[in-house]
Design a protein with these regions (language model features):
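Residues forming the flavin
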Residues: 1-16, 20-336
Length: 336
């Protein structure tokens, strides 16, 4: 469904994620946000943990409670309603023109039709750097052992997390949205495309750990044009759909095959969690441009030096990961 999926709907893409509540900014409103989420049903521990997280299972109820609270306060939520003809003073929703004092667009990183409309209407939209890659899955017990050693499995520690990065020249390879005890989920929002993302439940008690392993893409890689940025993502997603068999299975390649330039090795020890293992062997070098493959290979080898076993040859890599951030930037005025 192109209008209701993991990218669009109640809570947006964040509903199906690890539910991390972290930010790099230091703002007094952070505690206000945490307190509000707590009042709406988030667990008590988000108020005191250094790295709080909610988890998709609980977050779905939190979003439901938020909807009810917005309605109670006089707000109106219209689902399955497309916003068009957007100006600074009005918007058309399902054919109804709604005048307003201000329009706030919070459309996330995947509203490609909205981006295209804004560009066509003359709004200032520019191409920006983003990232593409794959989802790497390891046994959570292997990550725990590599990170905690003899203390792996201690309930007071919880499952181990990681965040890895490596640079070569002006390009980087890094892990993103690491989900301890989580699963890889299908996140396409257009027909004929395959996209991966990761999510965890609050308990983080799944067998696998997963994280996106992504390579930075610069505007000059795709023509420094906002529409070209969207098309770069879309082409990768279409190639993934074809490589997966055109039935929304995801393409998968083992880490060992990716490093050595081979393909066809089936998964064994680690079962990919994407739709319960609905993956097919593929050759990612036929999906990604050479600069992405070069950085993925080098980055994964480097990560194996930081976490023992990270670059194990039987690690399944599922793709494609294209929605880590928006490929375009809508320019704000000086008053914002």
């Amino acid at each position: 469904d192109t209008s209701t999926n993991i990218q669009f709907g109640a809570g947006g893409a964040g509903t199906f994620s690890d539910g991390k509540l972290t930010t790099r900014i230091n703002d007094p409103l952070i505690m206000y946000v945490l307190d509000m989420l707590h009042q709406l049903g988030a667990p008590d521990d988000i108020m005191y943990k250094a790295k709080p997280h909610i988890g998709t299972d609980i977050l779905r109820k939190v979003v439901e409670n938020a909807d009810k609270e917005i309605t109670r306060l006089g707000g109106e939520i219209r689902y399955k309603s497309k916003a068009e003809n957007i100006t600074s003073s009005s918007v058309t929703v399902n054919g109804e023109r709604i005048p307003c004092g201000a329009v706030i667009l919070a459309c996330g990183h995947s509203a490609r039709d909205t981006y295209s409309e804004l560009i066509g209407a003359g709004f200032s939209v520019e191409a920006k750097p983003f990232s593409v890659g794959v989802r790497a899955e390891h046994l959570q017990s292997d990550i725990d052992t590599a990170m905690y050693g003899a203390h792996a499995g201690d309930s007071q520690l919880g499952h181990a997390e990681y965040q890895l990065s490596w640079r070569q020249g002006d390009r980087g390879c890094y892990t993103f949205c690491m989900c301890p005890g989580g699963e890889v989920v299908p996140s396409a929002s257009e027909e004929g495309g395959v996209v991966t993302n990761g999510m965890s439940r609050h308990a983080r008690d799944g067998k696998n750990a997963n994280a996106a392993v992504c390579v930075s893409v610069k505007p000059e890689d795709y023509g420094n044009n906002p529409l070209s940025a969207i098309e770069f993502q879309r082409n990768l997603e279409k190639r993934a759909f074809l490589a997966g068999g055109e039935d929304y299975y995801a393409p998968m390649q083992t880490l060992g095959d990716l490093i050595s330039g081979k393909s066809g090795t089936e998964y064994k020890r680690i079962v990919p969690s994407y739709r319960g293992g609905k993956v097919r062997c593929a050759d990612f070098s036929k999906l990604f441009p050479p600069f992405v493959m070069e950085m993925l290979r080098a980055g994964l080898v480097n990560f194996g030096k930081k976490i023992k076993g990270y670059d194990a040859p039987d690690v399944p890599l599922t793709g494609v990961e294209t929605r880590t951030s928006s490929p375009v930037r809508i320019i704000r005025g000086e008053n914002l």
